[in-house]
Amino acid sequence: MLGGSVKSEVRASEPSPTCQDPETKAPHQDLPRPNQPAASGSVPSRPRRRPPPQRPHRCPDCPKAFSYPSKLATHRLAHGGTRPHPCPDCPKAFSYPSKLAAHRLTHSGARPHSCPHCPKAFGHRSKLAAHLWTHAPARPYPCPDCPKSFCYPSKLAAHRHTHHATDARPYPCPHCPKAFSFPSKLAAHRLCHDPPTAPSSQATGSHRCSSCNQAFGQRRLLLVHQRSHHQSEGQGERE
C-alpha cells in the first residue's frame, strides 16, 4: 500500500511528455491562469478583430451591398428617380430623409457647425471639414511653377491657370472673340454685352447708375458703363 501511494505521488509531480513537448502541447496550456502573472518579456495577445459585417443584399444596379432589405430598398430609390420626401418650403424633393434635413438648413439659415478657430459657421459638417483645411499649416499641394502651395487640388489647378493664362482660355465669349481662363471671368465679362435693363425695383444688381437707373452686378462694370455712355452723351451736348 505504501509503495503504491509513493508511486502515485511521483507520477502526479512529474510533467507528462505531452506537456514538455512544445509541438504536442495542448492549446489551453498556453493560456495564463487567472491568478498566474504573465511571464516577463511576453507579449500579450491582441484582441481578435470583429469579422466584417455581412452584406448579403446586393443592389442590381450598382456594386453596393447592404445588411438589411430595408437599406437596399431605400438605396434603390436613388436609381429609380423616386423622391418621396418633398420639402415643405420649396418644390424640391429628395430620396432620403437625411437629404431633406440637410436641405432644410438652407431655408432656416441655421449654421450649427461652428469653426473652433474663427467666427465662421456652416450648415453641413462636410463644409466645416473642408473649411478647417484653411487653418491647417500644412499645404500638401505645391505649385511646380512658383513657391505657393495649397490645401486642395482644385485650388492648385485654378492657380496654375494664372501661370498659363495666355495659353489656356477654354471659356470663349459667344458675343466677341475674347476667351477666358475661368467661368467666373466669362460670366463677369458677359455682363458687358447683356447688362440688366430692369427698373431699380426689379434689378438684381446692387450697383445702379444715377443717370439712367441701370443696375450692374459689379462696381467696375458700373464705372465702365458711366465712362462709355454718359461721357459720350456729355461730349455730344457740348458739341
UniProtKB/Swiss-Prot annotation:
Listed SUPFAM superfamilies: beta-beta-alpha zinc fingers
Pfam families noted in UniProt: zf-C2H2
ZnF C2H2-type: positions: 57-79, 85-107, 113-135, 141-163, 171-193, 207-230
Region (Disordered): 1-62
Coiled coil spans: none
Superkingdom field: Eukaryota
Alphabetized PROSITE patterns for the sequence: ZINC_FINGER_C2H2_1, ZINC_FINGER_C2H2_2
InterPro entries per record: Znf_C2H2_sf, Znf_C2H2_type
GO cellular component: nucleus
Compositionally biased intervals (Basic and acidic residues): 22-31
Biased composition (Basic residues): 46-57
Subcellular localization(s) per the UniProt record: Nucleus
Keywords attached to this entry: DNA-binding, Metal-binding, Nucleus, Repeat, Transcription, Transcription regulation, Zinc, Zinc-finger
GO molecular function, one term: DNA binding
Function: May be involved in transcriptional regulation.
Family the UniProt entry places it in: Belongs to the krueppel C2H2-type zinc-finger protein family.
Protein name listed in UniProt: Zinc finger protein 575
Gene encoding the protein: Znf575
